[in-house]
Curated annotation (Swiss-Prot):
Pfam families in alphabetical order: Peptidase_M48 (PF01435)
Compartments (UniProt record): Cell membrane
InterPro entries (UniProt xref): HtpX_protease, Pept_M48_protease_HtpX, Peptidase_M48
Recorded name of the encoding gene: htpX
CDD domains: M48B_HtpX_like
GO terms for MF: metalloendopeptidase activity; zinc ion binding
Cofactor annotation comment: Binds 1 zinc ion per subunit.
GO cellular component: plasma membrane
Name recorded for this polypeptide: Protease HtpX homolog
Broad enzyme group: hydrolase
Keywords annotated in UniProt: Cell membrane, Hydrolase, Membrane, Metal-binding, Metalloprotease, Protease, Transmembrane, Transmembrane helix, Zinc
Upper taxonomic lineage: Bacteria, Bacillati, Actinomycetota, Actinomycetes, Mycobacteriales
Cofactor(s) this protein requires: Zn(2+)
Membrane-spanning intervals of the chain: 10-30, 33-53, 145-165, 182-202
Biological process, per Gene Ontology: proteolysis
Length: 296
C-alpha cells in the first residue's frame, strides 16, 4: 500500500499558522500589551496542541487503555493490519459507551492510538470490525490524525476565546480606549462558527480517502460498507450526548456520533453522508461481487 502523509503535514502547518494568527488577532482587540501576551500564548498553545492532542480526544471519550488479554480480537486484528501495512502498531483504547463508534488520534504513527467504543465492539462481527480498524489505521498511516487532532484542539481553544471575548464585551467596555467592544462582540459570535468551519474543512474529504485506503488494506470494501450501515443505525438508537467537548472531537469518529434529527447533529455534521460512502465502497467491490448474508 502507498500512504500519503506529506500533504497532511503541510495542511497541519497551515492550520497552526492560522491558529496563531487568530489568537494574535483576538489579542490585538484588547490592546498592544494583550497582543504581546497573545503571541506567547499562541506559541505555547501550538506546542501543547502538537504534543497533547491525542490526550484531549481520549479524555473527552473517557477512554481506557487495553492490552491483548483485555481485548484479544481487537488486538489481533490491529496487529495483523499493522504488519500488513509495515507500520507501527498503535496503542489501543476502549471507551465504555453504548454509542457505536471508533476513532484514531495522535501526532504520528509511533504515537498513535485507536479507540473503539463498547457499543461498536458489541454491534459488529469480526469481519466488519476488521474493516473499521483498517479505516482508522489508514487515518494513522496517512497522518490524517495529526491534522484532525490539531483541528479539534483549535476548535476548543477558539470556543474558549469566543467566550472570553463575550465576557470582555459585557464587562470590559471601552474604558481604557484600547478596545473595540463591537469587534470583540463579533469575535464572540463568529468564533464558534469558525470552529465549526475548521472541523468541516478537514474532515469530509479525509473520510472518503480513509474508506478507500482502509478497504484496500483489508481487501474487503463490502465489510466496511456493512459496518457503516450498522453504525449509522446504531447512532440513531444510542448517540453520544450533545456536549461541547464531544462535539469538538466529533470529526475524529468514523461516523457522525450525534443523532441526525438533533440540532447539534446537523450543526456538527463533519462527515459525508453515509449513503455516499457506502455507494463508493460498493463500487470498489464491483457490481458482480457476492454480498455475504452475514453482512447484508
Amino acid at each position: 500500500m502507498t500512504w500519503h502523509p506529506h500533504a497532511n503535514r503541510a495542511k497541519t502547518f497551515l492550520l497552526l499558522v492560522l491558529f496563531s494568527g487568530l489568537i494574535v488577532g483576538v489579542g490585538a482587540l484588547f490592546g498592544r500589551n494583550i497582543m504581546f501576551l497573545a503571541v506567547l500564548f499562541a506559541i505555547g498553545m501550538n506546542a501543547y496542541v502538537y504534543f497533547n492532542s491525542d490526550k484531549l480526544a481520549l479524555r473527552a471519550m473517557h477512554a481506557q487503555p487495553v492490552n491483548e488479554m483485555q481485548a484479544p480480537v481487537m488486538y489481533k486484528i490491529v496487529r495483523e493490519l499493522a504488519t500488513t501495512a509495515r507500520q507501527p502498531m498503535p496503542r489501543l483504547y476502549i471507551s465504555d459507551t453504548a454509542a457505536p463508534n471508533a476513532f484514531a488520534t495522535g501526532r504520528n504513527p509511533r504515537n498513535a492510538a485507536v479507540c473503539c467504543t463498547t457499543g461498536i465492539l458489541q454491534m459488529l462481527n469480526e469481519r466488519e470490525l476488521r474493516a473499521v480498524l483498517g479505516h482508522e489505521l489508514s487515518h494513522v498511516y496517512n497522518r490524517d490524525i495529526l491534522i484532525s487532532c490539531v483541528a479539534g484542539a483549535m476548535a476548543s481553544v477558539i470556543t474558549a476565546l469566543a467566550n472570553l471575548a463575550f465576557f470582555a464585551s459585557m464587562f470590559g467596555g471601552n474604558r481604557d480606549g484600547g478596545t473595540n467592544p463591537l469587534a470583540i462582540l463579533l469575535v464572540s459570535l463568529l468564533g464558534p462558527i469558525a470552529a465549526t468551519v475548521i472541523r468541516l474543512a478537514v474532515s469530509r474529504s479525509r473520510e472518503y480517502q480513509a474508506d478507500q485506503s482502509g478497504a484496500e488494506l483489508t481487501g474487503d470494501p463490502l465489510a466496511l460498507a456493512s459496518a457503516l450501515r450498522k453504525i449509522s443505525a446504531g447512532v440513531e438508537r444510542a448517540p453520544l450526548p450533545p456536549e461541547p467537548q464531544l462535539a469538538d472531537q466529533a470529526h475524529l469518529m468514523i461516523a457522525n456520533p450525534f443523532r441526525s434529527g438533533e440540532k447539534i447533529g446537523k450543526l456538527f455534521a463533519t462527515h459525508p453522508p453515509i449513503a455516499d460512502r457506502i455507494a463508493r465502497l460498493e463500487a470498489m467491490a464491483g457490481p458482480d461481487t457476492y454480498r455475504h448474508p452475514g453482512l447484508y
